[in-house]
Amino acid sequence: MPRLEDWEIKKYWEIFQGLDPVNKKLTGDKVAPVLKNSRLQDDQLAKIWELSDIDSDGKLDFEEFCITMRLIFDMVNGVSTAIPKELPSWLIPSSKAHLIQANNAVRSNSNQGFDYEDDEDGLSDDFDWYISPTDKATYETIYNSNSDSYGRVKFESLNSLYSSLSKVPKSDISSAWNLVNPKSFETIDKDQVLVFLHILNQRENGKRIPRGVPASLRATFSKEVPNYDLNSVQAKPQPSVGTGRKSFANDYLNKIGQANTITERGTDFSSTEGTDWEEVRLRRELTDLENLLHKIQNGNKNDNSNTNDDSALLKYEYEQLLKYKQNKLSSANLSTKSKDLTEVKGDLDLIQSQVSTLEDFLKSKSSELEKLNEEIRSLKA
């Protein structure tokens, strides 16, 4: 079959826009008239929808809508005699290829080590989001061994790791990936990889995969405003407690020759510099310093000894530290605003590009219309 041509995509864009999409997506109700007009059988239309709705959100974005229209036209025009069982590679949008691969991994019946039915009855609900320094070092080793030159990791690049997990079914691997990748990108960054591996680690040790992630993580993964509630339980990491559980991905680390590179060390926050996480951390440190300063001030009021000079000096040092942290937080806020402006500029450039495309299309249609009018006038003459 021929690939999608530019003129064909422009035609689908006209139809898509005419159906009044909301947030760049069409619901089933809005697409239904187009589907019914094809006069295909209901089971055929249901199969087309299933193939087109790649991210399974019950809606169609423009790429998914193009798939729907092409499958319908191929059936109506006799190019195809049956709905394909799966999308041909030429019809899969590059931005969604990773979703197809993830879904196929869940459905396939390969002989890999993680292919078995999930025993939900034996799982516990005490999932712990805290990442210990040792676990973090393990996750970073795996990340460094699989990330590309841009620091990104694809779902399929960790296939060897998945096969080494004896207690994690494929469906849970896919669920964990979707949790850290709510925007359904083809690749994920370091923060997302570390949390993804942590979820797999917890599942390997008998913890049920959670239905969602903490607000602060969700904001980071979705590039939204993080949760700054310092009293939130999610904002306070739980202390590491020895559970006697086995080390994560030992066999996999041995396989890639990285088993001896993991050592116990303190938590390294350098990777969060310039991110939303750094701002959360600075706010937390500011609160701790303010509380400590408040205690010192109260202590001075109740202390009748001759240690006022020492207390005054200590108070001055903490005030200077507090001022430094406040300045650093202000710098982090400015950096965040600058990043937001960059994203807005990118959106504007994209919109401008779309407008230019539509203007070119309008000009071509206007030219065609003018030619038709000239032919009509010549015939009348």
Curated annotation (Swiss-Prot):
UniProt-listed InterPro entries: EF-hand-dom_pair, EF_Hand_1_Ca_BS, EF_hand_dom, EH_dom, End3
Subcellular location: Cell membrane; Endosome membrane; Cytoplasm, Cytoskeleton, Actin patch
SUPFAM superfamilies the UniProt entry points to: EF-hand
Keyword set includes Calcium: yes
Annotated coiled-coil segments of the chain: 278-381
Keyword Cell membrane on entry: yes
Membrane topology designation: Peripheral membrane protein
Taxonomic superkingdom: Eukaryota
Gene Ontology annotations for the cellular component aspect, listed alphabetically: actin cortical patch; actin cytoskeleton-regulatory complex; endosome membrane; plasma membrane
UniProt GO BP: actin filament organization; ascospore wall assembly; endocytosis; endosomal transport; reticulophagy
Residue sites binding Ca(2+) per the record: D53, D55, D57, K59, E64
Keywords recorded for this protein, A-Z: Actin-binding, Calcium, Cell membrane, Coiled coil, Cytoplasm, Cytoskeleton, Endocytosis, Endosome, Membrane, Metal-binding, Repeat
EH domain: residues covered: 8-98, 135-224
GO molecular function, one term: actin binding
A Pfam family it matches: EH
EF-hand domain: residues covered: 40-75
Gene3D superfamilies: EF-hand
Homology family: Belongs to the END3 family.
Assembly and interaction partners: Component of the PAN1 actin cytoskeleton-regulatory complex.
UniProt function note: Component of the PAN1 actin cytoskeleton-regulatory complex required for the internalization of endosomes during actin-coupled endocytosis. The complex links the site of endocytosis to the cell membrane-associated actin cytoskeleton. Mediates uptake of external molecules and vacuolar degradation of plasma membrane proteins. Plays a role in the proper organization of the cell membrane-associated actin cytoskeleton and promotes its destabilization.
PANTHER family, A to Z: EH DOMAIN (PTHR11216)
Protein known as: Actin cytoskeleton-regulatory complex protein END3
Gene behind this protein: END3
